[in-house]
């Protein structure tokens, strides 16, 4: 599975976990149809779940005029996943994480999602580089 596809499936799983309040294993089963789970996909989903408190704290610090709870569900899942990658996935360049997140936002979010996600993650990137 290519990493782009793994990110799409991770987004779908994280959305289910957040909105449907289902366990990560069940969400992964749902998005893979019960098939083999790509290691990168598993890393993204469990990494976000494991570090969600720190991720959310970082996102809250970089949201202007928004609360994390008011952010659209799909955008919130994208922001969490990209922030996880930027902070914890050493094998993924930060610029790749940011670009992939913007593409996912354009595909799965509304017409403003791409620029919103780009703006927030650019601030997260700057905060992480301090």
From Swiss-Prot:
Single GO cellular component term: cytosol
Highest taxon above the source species: Bacteria
UniProt keywords, alphabetically: RNA-binding, Transcription, Transcription antitermination, Transcription regulation
GO MF term (any one): RNA binding
Gene3D superfamilies, alphabetized: NusB-like (1.10.940.10)
A biological process from GO: DNA-templated transcription termination
Pfam families documented for this protein: NusB
Family per similarity comment: Belongs to the NusB family.
Function: Involved in transcription antitermination. Required for transcription of ribosomal RNA (rRNA) genes. Binds specifically to the boxA antiterminator sequence of the ribosomal RNA (rrn) operons.
This protein's name: Transcription antitermination protein NusB
Organism: Geobacillus kaustophilus (strain HTA426)
Taxonomy of the source species: Bacteria, Bacillati, Bacillota, Bacilli, Bacillales
Gene of this entry: nusB
